[in-house]
Amino acid sequence: MEIFNISDISDIKEENKNRVAALGFFDGIHKAHQSIIGRAVEAAEKGYISAVITLDKSPKEYFGKTSEESLTPTNKKNELLENLGVNEVYYLEFNEKLQNLSAEEFINNILKKLNVDKVFCGFDYRFGVKGLGTPDLIKDSGIEVTVQEKEKIDGEKISTTVLKEFVRKGEFSKYKKYTGRFYSISGLVVKGRQLGRTINFPTANLELDGKYLLPDTNGVYTTKIKVNNKIYKSVTNIGYNPTVSDEKNKKFIETHILEFDEDIYGERIEIYFYEFLRKEQKFESFDHLKEQLKLDKKTCEEKDY
């Protein structure tokens, strides 16, 4: 899969090969997104290049209306798109120039230049200045358009907003129902205080490689971890480690991996969230902390997931 980062649309070169494009921001890549992208990939099998044309950030984020946290930061989004069979991804930098681009200019200077013959998008897809561009406008320009209608699960619309609420509330089974996978975050293992080793409970300290959305509740979660392409059960704490420190400037993400004893400093890992166990708490001593960690581990071992 080829990735193109476009900071200025004037840099887009006219292409000769015909493309089928999926249009949208696609944060979370839920089942409705997967349907849009999958249909584009399938249509491209008849001699086209399959492409996703998206933004490097959401307009809401650009205008400061939402936080920067994402369900699928760029690295994760690329991984999922490649798994769906996409040939090319175009990330348009959402800057002042793109913000003021008319809908007609979007069609002529992006879709037409990339030789897009067919477009797949959601029912609420909008583009151009003030979001005035609609799928019908693309259709009027001579490009074939297929619009994905609203999809629901249990009577609720499938949307990124709903997914984010699931993550914030720790409702990971519901997240899986809407996406087909458990919520995950990834990054590098870095050295922490190494206090876990002193109580025979070593942890991998994660430094995120993207601006991932985290659950609202600090505490302990049953998780799985992928390290060196192998999957292990794990128990993960998100929070400030109040037993160790009173500082609340930075949240720590620490994972104890079951049946594992390897040095993985500097390795990239991915943590998959399954269930919330308990809230983070301040213990009177390290002995009390150690006893609770043993209980957390036992609970994790006994759960079938």
Descriptions of predicted regions:
Residues 2-11, 90:
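Short acidic-hydrophobic, aromatic-tinged amphipathic segments that line or gate anion-handling sites
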Residues 10-73:
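N-terminal catalytic cores of NTP/NDP-binding nucleotidyl/phosphoryl-transfer enzymes
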Residues 30, 81, 119, 175, ...:
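Residue-level signal for inorganic ion chemistry
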Residues 49-51, 87-88, 118, 144:
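Residues at the starts of beta-strands that form the adenosine-phosphate
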Residues 69-77, 99-107:
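Glycine-rich, highly charged phosphate/nucleotide-binding loops
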Residues 76-90:
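A glycine-rich helix N-cap at a beta->alpha junction
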Residues 100-203, 284-288:
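Classical nucleotidyltransferase
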Residues 193-305:
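Phosphate/ribose-recognition catalytic cores of enzymes acting on nucleotide-derived substrates
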